[in-house]
Each structure stands twice: as C-alpha cells, then as structure tokens.
Amino acid sequence: NDNHVEGKILRLRQQYFLSAASIGDIVQNHLSSYATLENLPDKVAIQLNDTHPTLAIPEMMRILLDECGFDWDKAFSICQKVFSYTNHTVMAEALEKWNVDIFKMTLPRIYQIVVEMDRRAREELAKAFPGDQGKIDYMALIGDNQVRMANICAYTANSINGVSKLHSEIIKESVFHDYYLFKPNAFKNVTNGIAYRRWLLASNPGLCKLLDETIGDGYKHDASDLTKLNKYADDKTVLKKLNEIKLANKKDFASYLAKSTGQVIDPNSIFDCQVKRMHEYKRQH
C-alpha cells in the first residue's frame, strides 16, 4: 500500500531494485561476450512496459558514466538507441510521478542524473519550440516538485507505442501530443498480444503437434495461419484431441505444483488463474 510516505519509499526502492538488477545483468552478460558497451545498441533492445521500470534509463546512464567512463553525449546516445517505451495510460493525471524530496532522499545519484537529463531536455525543447515556455514546462522531466517518469521515457525512447491502434492515436493526440510534435517518427502502434513462439511453440508441444497435423506448420512463421483452425470448430475428432491435450497439460501442472509446493489439486477441475500483484485495488481480498 503506497498511500503513505513509507509505502511510496518502499515502492520506489522496489522499482529501482528490479530495474538496477535487470540492467546490471544485461550489462554483465554483454560485457562477458563483447568486452565493450560501444556496440550495446547493436545487440540489446530494452522495452519499458509502462513507467514502472523507467529507472532503468538513469541506471544505465549511471553505469555508462560512473563505471565505464563514457561522456554524457555518448552515454545518452546509447540509451536512446537501446530503450523503447510502451504506454498504457491515456490520462495525463494518471501518469506516474514521484515527489522530488522522496526521490532525492531515496536515490541521490539517480536524482542527479535525472536533473541533468531535465536540464539538457529543456535546452533541446527550447530550440524545438522557441518561446513556448508552457510547452517546455509540460514536457520537462521534472516539474511542480515531481519527477515525471513518463516524460523520462518519452524523451529518451527511440520508439513510443500504445497497445491498440486507437490507443496509439489517442496518446499522439492528447497525453503525448507535444512529444509527438517533437519526435513524430518515434510513435508507433503495437497491438497487445502474446509471444506465441514462447507460449505456444515452446510451452505447449502437445497443441503444436495437433496444429501440425491439422493446418501444417506454416503458423510457426506466420501467426495468421492459425485462423485455418477455424474450419475444425465442429470437428469432433479434433475437439476430442484438444481436450486430451488440455487435460494432459493440467496433469503436468498439478504434478509440478505438488512436487514444488506440496499443494494437491484435481486436474479435472477448472483452473481459474490470475498472475497479478497482490493489491487491494485488484479486488483480491
């Protein structure tokens, strides 16, 4: 619960911990293979899914500046090429912001980097929108005693997308309209979906075998081929095989759960699952 100062500090520390751990791992793995970060943009792409991992940007800057000796321009150029941002919020008032005092106290070095990012951003924006101080203040990374996570992402990222065609148009016309004017080529649409090569090809070999037998293996390279399965919607033989695959997968999961946690569940029951953080606003209580 972050309705009080202690909760806000804890959440900010959690966000930094997860971001810093991820960036540290990426950098370490890259250096073990290439011994330099000069080519990081050629080998690594980091997608920021909403603003919660925004601290990955100043943390990457910290590593490049403090630990690797890059100058600011080179370090920021690497970040611009590496980071992309997916927006999930169309209301400006709902965008994530952090009180400057909390941010500065909790993450002093990261705050210093964000302050310098803000200073340079304001200089660049002043050249793009001369005399329009209102626009510059709205797009700034720090303002009204708040660190604006979405603006850090929008200013840095090489790609900014919504999660549906309509959503992507809305953010261009409203919440990020000024950034759209500033860097229009960065705005794209990526409709929400799953990485089916992971959640189907790698995770569900039984279903893949059935698909191979019914529609061929073209779907492995072109997901639109999956629509060919529609013609089997009333095929009792195919539906029977599908149910057998589902049951086998449920038995596998039940076995794994029993071995790893000691919990025993009936694979013939309905599995109603939620993978979400535990929080009162999720109505889990």
What annotation goes with each model-predicted range?
Residues 1-285:
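A conserved ligand/cofactor-binding region detector
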